[in-house]
């Protein structure tokens, strides 16, 4: 049996994507819509308070295309907190005019290839990646993925050293986009339908295409990568929520 990779796990992660039922939303009066928006922003303000204490983070984006209208990415120390956030949101008036489009549950993850005598949880750089403050980048790209397990192309049957070598080559491509693309990898084995979630942030949306296309030619992706649905969107600052929902 091949050796399993040890992982470092950080904050739990929820990607919550919803579509707006615009036809139903239009039936409300202007005052009713305003009250619903204010109620929602009060919930978001609670998230801001948590982020200010470094006990979680979140991001809010509009989604381009017909897969969804809005994407929320929430990071918290426990799965229970994610559940509480989702439930509180579902109880708002605005949620009555939202249709669930997609969700993904995972935990921020790093592969532990550090020396055995080093405690990774004492490394500030690693802690910043396990418990990240999500950037306010202009654009987001999220997609789930698996490692292939078919015939000779079975990632999990490869020796540890071979997997390490290929992942090192794979990561070199990503490092070329440092300063252009911020990446958050989250593990979801046993949590959701795929094995990982990949969330990318960038101010220049074209960098997503360039990075992912270049990685397609790397063996890790070309031979062993299997991908789910891609979602791409634009940042939705708190102060623009009312305009986004205005009729």
Curated annotation (Swiss-Prot):
Record: residues binding Fe-coproporphyrin III: 129, 143-147, 170, 183, 221
Disulfide bonds: none
Essential cofactor(s): Fe-coproporphyrin III
Top-level taxon in the UniProt lineage: Bacteria
Catalytic activity reported: Fe-coproporphyrin III + 2 H2O2 + 2 H(+) = heme b + 2 CO2 + 4 H2O; Fe-coproporphyrin III + H2O2 + H(+) = harderoheme III + CO2 + 2 H2O; harderoheme III + H2O2 + H(+) = heme b + CO2 + 2 H2O
Cofactor binding, per record: Fe-coproporphyrin III acts both as a substrate and a redox cofactor.
Pathway participation: Porphyrin-containing compound metabolism; protoheme biosynthesis
Protein's UniProt keywords contain Oxidoreductase: yes
Keywords: Heme, Heme biosynthesis, Iron, Metal-binding, Oxidoreductase
Annotated active site: 143
Keyword Nucleotide-binding attributed: no
EC number, UniProt record: 1.3.98.5
Pfam family, any one: Chlor_dismutase
PANTHER family with a match to the protein in the record: COPROHEME DECARBOXYLASE, HEME-DEPENDENT PEROXIDASE YWFI-RELATED
Function: Involved in coproporphyrin-dependent heme b biosynthesis. Catalyzes the decarboxylation of Fe-coproporphyrin III (coproheme) to heme b (protoheme IX), the last step of the pathway. The reaction occurs in a stepwise manner with a three-propionate intermediate.
Protein name: Coproheme decarboxylase
Annotated source species: Bacillus cereus (strain ATCC 10987 / NRS 248)
């Amino acid at each position: 049996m091949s050796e399993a990779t040890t992982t470092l796990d950080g904050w739990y992660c929820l990607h919550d994507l919803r579509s707006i039922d615009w036809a139903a939303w239009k039936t409300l009066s202007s005052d009713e819509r305003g009250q619903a928006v204010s109620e929602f922003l009060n919930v978001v303000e609670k998230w801001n308070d948590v982020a200010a204490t470094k006990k979680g983070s979140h991001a809010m984006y509009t989604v381009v295309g017909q897969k969804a209208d809005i994407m929320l990415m929430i990071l918290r120390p426990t799965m229970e907190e994610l559940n509480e956030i989702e439930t509180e949101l579902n109880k708002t008036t605005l949620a009555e005019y939202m249709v669930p489009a997609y969700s993904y549950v995972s935990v921020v993850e790093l592969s532990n290839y550090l020396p055995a005598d080093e405690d990774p949880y004492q490394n500030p750089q690693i802690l910043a990646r396990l418990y990240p403050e999500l950037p306010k980048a202009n654009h987001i790209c999220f997609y789930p993925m698996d490692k292939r397990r078919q015939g000779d192309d079975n990632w999990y049957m490869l020796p540890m050293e071979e997997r390490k070598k290929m992942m090192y080559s794979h990561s070199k491509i990503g490092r070329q986009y440092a300063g252009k693309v911020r990446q958050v990898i989250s593990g979801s084995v046993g949590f959701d339908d795929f094995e990982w979630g990949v969330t990318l942030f960038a101010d220049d949306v074209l960098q997503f295409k360039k990075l992912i296309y270049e990685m397609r030619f790397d063996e890790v992706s070309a031979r062993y990568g299997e991908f789910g649905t891609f979602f791409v969107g634009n940042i939705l600052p708190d102060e623009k929520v009312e305009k986004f929902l205005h009729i």
